[in-house]
């Protein structure tokens, strides 16, 4: 365990030995403050963008309605990250061709199947039976159709429980594509296959995948130049907006002087903004993005305080202060100075959010977020008590608490604030009851975090993760626990899409459900190979550079 001895500020004149993390400083410094005077797109760029958009719309509307060409165009538009301009046209087509997905070859069927499931339609997977032999195995000659194999691989990712044929399809295509990949040399197709094997569309963050796909598409000799030009221009215009947003949020962060006063916390504002961008990137959700970024930033401070810095007595006081949710509580409970900074900063953020929502006559909705914040902090406190009491709970107890410590119930609820009229009181009443789709997303978040960060956390001293809980309860090795937890994560993805198909088209609009799904996608990305939030300088830094700094030429 890594320890440091620090003297707490004047109100608690005692020496306390505290744990500290091994995280590095921010890799960005004041970089994003440089965009304060960024003006956005020029009038000429705006006009060009609008003209190109209408040309793409014509292409989409005029494409043959019953042809593979239409599906290919929809897929390309989605992969290029510009589908948000044509949601109505895409939905209108997909919902009227719901029963036609089984027509065509492997590529056509798999492509249509995936596009329908992405839209929230649970179409049957029986159409794939014609590609299997008498034993139920996929026919080996399919390996000669690389495009079809890739399409089947992507489609099978959207499987739910009981769809054994899709489980088999995923195993088959994963194995065969890995064998085929070296034979494709360094072609654009090889790059797409390699990317899909690591980052399937199911897990994709729109802005990250769009940046990559624009490059793939440009190398395709059959690319449509008009569509490519539109995708590039749209990416760059959005990037300018995102730069300006992050500049404004960075100014807020600097004014809090967090790094100076709370040196133990992870200074990860750009990474948090990237997280929010993964939930929604569209210009109409600018207010929601700013709200969510500030909210997650405060959660990160609180998380670090409960995980490594606060004593049990201090955390008891802070938990009570959160429960009271009153600025006077910091003085009444005599919070330590460093905790007052966090507490007052949190309440200030919520006051600011309330003012933003008042413009839409929706300030009352903030109470839903506050309720979830209180639940989350109480769950953090439970973990602290386990740590100080040297207790390793049973897996069931750990996971019940872990739904809240994942922070995703709180984050998902807060992500809907600032989204406008689409998020109604009925929607918030639904989400605070922790529907299965949200529980599934939270389990994915909790367990992925545990898998990739538990060793580092145990070195410094932390509450037991799901890995330690499972190892102790079932008497297994770390490797065996990892396998079991990976299996639980896979099953949770199935749960998530099962519920998406059930709820889509009910009182909850698809755009709200996508926030929950996108949160799961972000956590998959952040914890793909490492804890990239804590250690962004290894890989995440380069991704953020491409998404938030470097325009496409």
Curated annotation (Swiss-Prot):
Motif annotated as DDXXD motif, chain positions: 303-307
Entry comment describing in which tissues the protein is expressed: Expressed in leaves, trichomes and flowers.
Binding residues annotated for Mg(2+) 3, in chain numbering: 457
Pathway the protein takes part in: Secondary metabolite biosynthesis; terpenoid biosynthesis
Name used for this protein in its record: Terpene synthase 16
Cofactor binding note of this UniProt entry: Binds 3 Mg(2+) or Mn(2+) ions per subunit.
GO biological process assignments: diterpenoid biosynthetic process
Entry text on domains: The Asp-Asp-Xaa-Xaa-Asp/Glu (DDXXD/E) motif is important for the catalytic activity, presumably through binding to Mg(2+).
The protein's required cofactors: Mg(2+); Mn(2+)
Residue sites binding Mg(2+) 2 per the record: 303, 307
Pfam families: Terpene_synth (PF01397), Terpene_synth_C (PF03936)
Transmembrane segments: none
Sorted UniProt keywords: Magnesium, Metal-binding
Binding site for Mg(2+) 1: 303, 307
GO molecular function (one): magnesium ion binding
């Amino acid at each position: 365990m890594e320890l440091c001895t620090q003297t707490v500020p004047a109100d608690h004149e005692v020496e306390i030995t505290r744990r500290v993390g091994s995280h590095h400083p921010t890799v960005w410094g004041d970089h994003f403050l440089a965009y304060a005077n960024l003006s956005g797109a020029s009038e000429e760029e705006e006009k060009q963008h609008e003209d190109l958009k209408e040309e793409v719309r014509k292409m989409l509307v005029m494409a043959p309605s019953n042809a593979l060409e239409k599906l290919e165009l929809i897929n390309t538009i989605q992969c290029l990250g510009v589908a948000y301009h044509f949601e109505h046209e895409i939905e209108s087509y997909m919902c009227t061709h719901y029963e036609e997905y089984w027509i065509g070859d492997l590529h056509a069927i798999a492509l249509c199947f995936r596009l329908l499931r992405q839209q929230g339609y649970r179409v049957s997977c029986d159409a794939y039976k014609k590609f299997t032999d008498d034993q139920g195995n996929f026919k080996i000659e399919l390996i000669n159709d690389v495009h079809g194999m890739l399409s089947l691989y992507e489609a099978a990712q959207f499987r739910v429980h009981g769809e054994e044929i899709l489980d088999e399809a995923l195993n088959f295509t994963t194995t065969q594509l890995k064998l085929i990949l070296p034979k494709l040399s360094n072609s654009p197709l090889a790059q797409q296959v390699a990317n899909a094997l690591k980052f399937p569309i199911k897990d994709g963050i729109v802005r990250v995948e769009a940046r990559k796909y624009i490059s793939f598409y440009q190398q395709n000799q059959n690319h449509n130049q008009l569509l490519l030009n539109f995708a590039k221009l749209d990416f760059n215009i959005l990037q300018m907006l995102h730069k300006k947003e992050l500049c404004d949020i960075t100014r807020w962060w600097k004014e809090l002087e967090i790094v100076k006063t709370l040196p133990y916390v992870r200074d990860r504002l750009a990474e948090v903004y990237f997280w929010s961008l993964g939930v929604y990137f569209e210009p109409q959700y600018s207010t929601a993005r700013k709200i969510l970024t500030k909210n997650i930033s405060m959660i990160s401070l609180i998380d670090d305080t409960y995980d490594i810095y606060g004593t049990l007595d201090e955390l008891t006081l802070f938990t009570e202060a959160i429960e009271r949710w009153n600025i006077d509580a910091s003085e009444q409970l005599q919070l330590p100075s460093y905790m007052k900074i966090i507490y007052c900063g949190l309440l200030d953020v919520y006051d600011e959010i309330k003012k933003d929502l008042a413009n839409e006559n929706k300030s009352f909705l903030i109470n839903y977020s506050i309720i979830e914040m209180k639940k989350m902090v109480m769950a953090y406190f439970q973990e602290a008590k386990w740590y100080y009491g040297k207790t390793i709970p049973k897996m069931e107890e750990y996971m019940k608490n872990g739904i809240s410590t994942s922070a995703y119930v709180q984050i998902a609820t807060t992500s809907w604030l600032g989204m406008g009229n689409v998020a109604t009181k009925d929607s918030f009443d639904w989400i605070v009851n922790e529907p299965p789709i949200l529980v599934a997303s939270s389990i994915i978040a909790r367990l992925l975090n545990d898998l990739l960060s538990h060793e580092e956390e145990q070195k410094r001293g932390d509450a037991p993760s799901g890995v330690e809980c499972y190892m102790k309860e079932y008497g297994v090795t770390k490797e065996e626990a990892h396998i079991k937890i990976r299996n639980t994560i896979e099953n949770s993805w199935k749960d998530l899409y099962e519920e998406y198909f059930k709820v889509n088209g009910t009182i909850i609009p698809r755009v709200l459900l996508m926030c929950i799904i996108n949160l799961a996608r972000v956590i998959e990305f952040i914890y793909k190979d490492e804890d990239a939030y804590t250690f962004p300088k290894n890989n995440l830094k380069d991704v953020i550079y491409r998404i938030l700094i470097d325009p496409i030429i």
